[in-house]
Amino acid sequence: MKGFTFVIALIMACSISLSMFSSCGRNDAVQNSDTASGTDSATNIKVTSDTLRVKKVDNISDDFIFGMDASCVPSLEACGIKYYDHNNNEKDVYKILAENGVNYIRVRIWNDPFDKNGNGYGGGNCDIENAIKVGKRATQNGMKLLVNFHYSDFWADPQKQAPPKAWQGMSIDEKCDAVYKYTKESLKKLADAGIDIGMVQVGNETNGFMCGEKDWAKISALMSAGSKATREICPEALVVLHFSNPELVNRYAGYAYELNRFGVDYDVFASSYYSFWHGTFENLKTELEKVTSRYGKKAIIAETSYAYTAEDTDFHANTIGSGFGASEGYPFSVQGQANMLRDVIATAASIENCLGVFYWEGTWIAAGGKTQAENRELWEKHGSGWASSFVAEYDPEDGGKWYGGCAVDNQALFDKNGKALESLKVFALVREGNLDS
């Protein structure tokens, strides 16, 4: 997710910046109080809702991806967090997701998110072992896995793409070899664990910047190394490249041009889309179709999310919240969150060759402490906040200064007590809808 770097700055500058991207283009769902139900005709998943209304989205394919990044779950469970379905039954959270129409899980992988003493950097301490835990549970519940390699020891986004500690000082040829070997070894571990790998993402929000490199010839070489390893270990998996900032006209077309110029082998051009940063739905569609139509690639919305409340639930500032970040027509409410998700899905379904949508960290809730001090202890011990103090050695200018809790707990699809929100039902309701036109 783009934005942890700028959580504090965004809060301070919101009154200036948010007016630029406040409208998403439409809001097709409305709230109604009568009980209604919907069935996902592709999976026979049936849900009902007393409060939520979701308008049907046309032209959703049977294999449309309703995905969820759920990378932080093991670290939260280590804090004592439990998850509950809509009937207050405690369950494996991945089972709850599957029961509500989610068919794909996305998990990020950092090479070595620990200091020399074994203290985790936070953000879920998302190494390969964490990915195996997540992947096994996804597969056990009938969901495929998107493996998201950052090729860093911590968050990689448009502003920072630090190479792993072990790769610092390497030449580009050495780094490409390291990417190839690391990707291959990691995917083999996942495959050997019986995990159903459907897609492999080579880099995260690589906007002309990846693993410390800013030259497109070098970036393309790194991507090609990751793609080659993927083809060898997971020949049936789709290779995904991920970018951000679709609000910038022709930016994606420029990236796709460079990828084509350097012959990078990939299948899917992925975009982040957060309405409070990334402009309108119409622009998102336009920019992605410049890639799918010109280069014959598939597209996917790899990240999106929206707030169900303005409340901060863990004593750490949120990316959006009270007084800032609301997109026009989408209040911070469970219905508002559902409307946003429904309309992102509708946009994806309208884009040429778009595979689907992944909601970002919809399971990342507060660590469970009753005070900031209690939460801080949990964040430091289990890595359940966005960054721990231990990351200062690796990321001194961002994580080292602004470490703390979750900045997106109010954008989860579970409440602060771990109970599934009604908005989680959107995935199952959206094929048929439960709202009369």
PLM region spans:
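Conserved, mostly hydrophobic/aromatic
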Residues: 68, 97, 148, 200, ...
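Short, acidic/polar
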Residues: 80-98, 179-189, 249-259, 340-344
